[in-house]
Amino acid sequence: MKKKILLTIAMCLILSMGMTACGSKEKSTAVQSTNKVISVTPTDGYVAKPQEGYEQIMIFPKDKQDDNNTEYIQIDAVDPDGALNSLVGFTVKGYKQGTTNYTMDQLNADLDAKASEEKASGVVGTFDNKTSVKLGEVDYIKFDLTRNGVDANEYYGVVDGTPVYITVVGLIDKDGVSGMLNSIEYKIKK
């Protein structure tokens, strides 16, 4: 009888400690860009900051949010008026501001043209290793490269006829990054 009582008490303690531990974890909430075009849910240990005035979210490790150019994630989309305000604007020259009819074929052609342009100017390797990946609901063209002296990935995609862009610098193999990338959602106004 004593064994049953002790076993029951031990089970109750284990159950209550488990429930307390589960209940104390705070769930991350999605962060949205200026005009709510981009939404991403940062994982534990990361902070997401919308960039004021345009559709971009920057994500940093919590302990490296200031003056950090070697560990970050940058997510870009077009503004509601169709303007591109990021690096993707220099790469996707076939996109016409304010339109929503850009395609993956056009994106591939723009990326191939950018690779040719860079090779002609002596830059080698940036757009040479193109692979297709899916993050969340979006198909992307991914490149492995070096940015600011560290390994990086660039992702170019098309959502609702507009280009989107993600760069992951220095965090490509870190815990939680994959979950954040798969949590990205876009709401492009047509």
Where are these regions (language model features)?
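Hydrophobic alpha-helical context, especially transmembrane and signal-peptide helices
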Residues: L7-I14, D128, A152, Y156, ...
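Generic hydrophobic alpha-helical membrane-segment signal
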Residues: Q32-S33, G125, Y155
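Short, solvent-exposed coil/turn segments at beta-strand boundaries
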Residues: T41-G45, K62-Q65, D81, G136-V138, ...
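N-terminal targeting sequences that direct proteins away from the cytosol to non-cytosolic compartments
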Residues: L6-A10, S16-D66, V168-K190
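Bacterial Sec-dependent N-terminal signal peptides
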Residues: M1-I5
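Short, well-structured beta-strand
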Residues: K134-K190
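Generic anion/oxyanion-binding catalytic loop in active/binding sites
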Residues: M11, K96, I166
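Conserved polar/disulfide-associated segments of primarily extracytoplasmic proteins
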Residues: P61-A152
